[in-house]
Amino acid sequence: MDSCDYKSYAQALDLVNDKELIEEYKKYHKNVWKEVNEALCSIGIKKMKIFLLGTHLFMYYEARADFDPKIDFQKYTELTPKANEWDNLMRKFQQKISDIPENQLGEWWSPMDLVYDLDWFKQQQ
């Protein structure tokens, strides 16, 4: 697969507003379990980054063009008990974003709309 076979995604989620829990969450992500990374790669994720601002998480990832977050993230938790354990463990730190329209709520992470891409304008030149 070349870079044309991948698509970009962005999702958002909040952390529980507790400084100790946030620090613990960050520590876990410095040492993500090997099985979690392997499971993410096996469902077609090429790149993934999570950013934090206060209690707000922003996740950017690139996945194969036919990736479906609703289906493939479910597969990820089913692939290995460790991936499922990780997902359940992270839930103690996380909470859904409370102030977004109901139609934009995801299963857990909420999908974000792309409103700007520099590549749109590079193609015009």
Curated annotation (Swiss-Prot):
Pfam families recorded: rhaM
Q: Which GO terms describe its molecular function?
A: racemase and epimerase activity, acting on carbohydrates and derivatives
Superkingdom of origin = Eukaryota
List the InterPro entries: Carb_Metab_Mutarotase (IPR052996), Dimeric_a/b-barrel (IPR011008), Rham/fucose_mutarotase (IPR008000)
Q: Which family does it belong to?
A: Belongs to the UPF0734 family.
Q: PANTHER family per the record? A: UPF0734 PROTEIN DDB_G0273871/DDB_G0273177, UPF0734 PROTEIN DDB_G0273871_DDB_G0273177
- Recorded protein name is UPF0734 protein DDB_G0273871/DDB_G0273177
- Source organism per entry reads Dictyostelium discoideum
